[in-house]
């Protein structure tokens, strides 16, 4: 019975739960790695002592957080749980493929961990650039294992993307048009399309790297007529859409949370929100070389990538101001979930502003590979994606479990986390502007103060993570059941009780829209 339910599951709720648990567990590993990094940088001099080991930590931290924490939780966890409920579908379109998408991840994770523990580990950074990732600078099987790990995670995501696209387009009730689906469903749809178009390019790039390393090809080796810059183009053509994949489902969740706790029945500017997400998805594919301003591109190429990158600020601004407009004039309920959403809106915007700074190719020449870039993407990930995940979790936890969290503890958790992440990443802007480079385990004494403060902040965040574990334990042991939910047209996932029955719809859902 246990095996049939949890190993061979074809139920979107159970698979979503597996994704959430796996992502939470991987998040602990990723947090542990980040704390080792910050412990090393807490003061000048060496702690771990070995720069290769330090770089392995940095690389593993990135891969674990991206492929095994944010993506499984947002797309696999929240996506699986909520998309079928929100569109009134009995399950996902391909329930068994759904199960395979999940079970490809633990082996992938195992391969990544193995790559760190054999030979010298893969100390390449998450970008895995050759020639550093070639078989000379990284002899041994570490990088090969990392490549195989990425292949498995990539196949998992591609299959999941196919599943979500088919489900969303094909499994709505007859009377429901695409423009009547909730914004979270739209965000998952756009994310799935991005995954489907970008991951094959990554697969091509790392497969060529694999053959360069093992089969004597020279795709990225100038000695044989190859070009390492080609790898950078292939990687970033995936890598830039990837960062939008990480944030788009968060946009969808924030839209729902803000609408719900403002007491509104729908978000402000529904069509504009959709247009903004689709635009961000499209533009995300034509700006990749802004990661490569320092490799020596033509001035007109740099001008194009600078302006194209800045254009993304427009649809992003549409979303931010629509969230503020949704809040405006609402009967605001100060729940923990809304606090996460407000924190998201503010801090994501700060991260976006530093992004506009980095979009300028001339400025980026100076700031590239400094801590300014680290601060920028951690503001949009550690305070964008993670805040959205936390907000979505405290908002939908009663739906998933049937129990309510202790609101006071949840608010305290938010405050500790808020202080922790800001204390960790705000000082890194100063370090970057002073020219401290990324991916080094030691630094001149001049950078000591801000690094020490940054490391203190990371330990505050650790306290918040431990408190979160306690809060979840407290909810499951106290067993406060859900009393009532505010139902509106945009809240259909709550319609079937908390938690919903194992099989939501035994027959097709009947939808009678207000307009058609």
Swiss-Prot record:
Residues 41-50, 118-140, 213-227, 287-298, 358-370, 434-446 are mitochondrial intermembrane. GO terms for molecular function: cytochrome-c oxidase activity; heme binding; metal ion binding. Residues 1-11, 87-94, 171-182, 262-269, 328-335, 401-406, 479-516 are mitochondrial matrix. It is a multi-pass membrane protein. Heme a3 binds at residue 376. PANTHER family: CYTOCHROME C OXIDASE SUBUNIT 1. This is Cytochrome c oxidase subunit 1.
């Amino acid at each position: 019975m246990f095996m049939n339910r949890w190993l061979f599951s074809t139920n979107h709720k159970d698979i979503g739960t597996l994704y959430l648990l796996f992502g939470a567990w991987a998040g602990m590993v990723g947090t542990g790695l980040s704390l080792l990094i910050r412990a090393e940088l807490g003061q000048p001099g060496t702690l771990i002592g070995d720069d290769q080991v330090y770089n392995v930590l940095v690389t593993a931290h990135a891969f674990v957080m991206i492929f095994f924490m944010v993506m499984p939780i947002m797309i696999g966890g929240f996506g699986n749980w909520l998309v079928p409920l929100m569109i009134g579908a009995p399950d996902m379109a391909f329930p068994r493929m759904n199960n395979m998408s999940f079970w490809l991840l633990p082996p992938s994770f195992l391969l990544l961990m193995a790559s760190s523990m054999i030979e010298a580990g893969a100390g390449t950074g998450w970008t895995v650039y050759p020639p550093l990732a070639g078989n000379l600078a990284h002899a041994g099987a570490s990088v090969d294992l990392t490549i195989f790990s990425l292949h498995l995670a990539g196949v998992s995501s591609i299959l999941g993307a196919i599943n979500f696209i088919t489900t969303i387009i094909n499994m709505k009730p007859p009377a429901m048009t695409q423009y009547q689906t909730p914004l979270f469903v739209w965000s998952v749809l756009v994310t799935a399309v991005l995954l489907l178009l970008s991951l094959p390019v990554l697969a091509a790039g790392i497969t060529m790297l694999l053959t360069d390393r093992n089969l004597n090809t020279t795709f990225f080796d100038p000695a044989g007529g190859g070009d390492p810059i080609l790898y950078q183009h292939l990687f970033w053509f995936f890598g830039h859409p990837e960062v939008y994949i990480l944030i788009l489902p968060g946009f969808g969740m924030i839209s729902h949370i803000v609408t719900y706790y403002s007491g509104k029945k729908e978000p402000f500017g529904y069509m504009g929100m959709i247009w903004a997400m689709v635009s961000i998805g499209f533009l995300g594919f034509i700006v990749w070389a802004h990661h490569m301003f320092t490799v020596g591109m033509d001035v007109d190429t740099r001008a194009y990538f600078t302006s194209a990158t800045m254009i993304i600020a427009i649809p992003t601004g549409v979303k931010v101001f629509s969230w503020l407009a949704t809040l405006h004039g609402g009967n605001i309920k100060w729940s923990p979930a809304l606090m996460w959403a407000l924190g998201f809106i503010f801090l994501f915007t700060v991260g976006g502003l530093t992004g506009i700074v980095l979009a300028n190719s001339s400025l980026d020449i100076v700031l590239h590979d400094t801590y300014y870039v680290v601060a920028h993407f951690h503001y949009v990930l550690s305070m964008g994606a993670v805040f959205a995940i936390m907000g979505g979790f405290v908002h939908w936890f009663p739906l998933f479990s049937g129990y309510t969290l202790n609101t006071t503890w949840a608010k305290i958790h938010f405050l500790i986390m808020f202080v922790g992440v800001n204390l960790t990443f705000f000082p890194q802007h100063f370090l970057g502007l002073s020219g401290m480079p990324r991916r080094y385990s030691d630094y001149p004494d001049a950078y000591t103060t801000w690094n020490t403060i940054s490391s203190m902040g990371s330990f505050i965040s650790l306290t918040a993570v431990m408190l979160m574990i306690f809060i979840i334990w407290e909810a499951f042991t106290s067993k406060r059941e859900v009393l009532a939910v505010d139902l509106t047209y945009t809240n259909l996932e709550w319609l079937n009780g908390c938690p919903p029955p194992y099989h939501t719809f035994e027959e097709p859902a009947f939808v009678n829209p207000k307009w058609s």
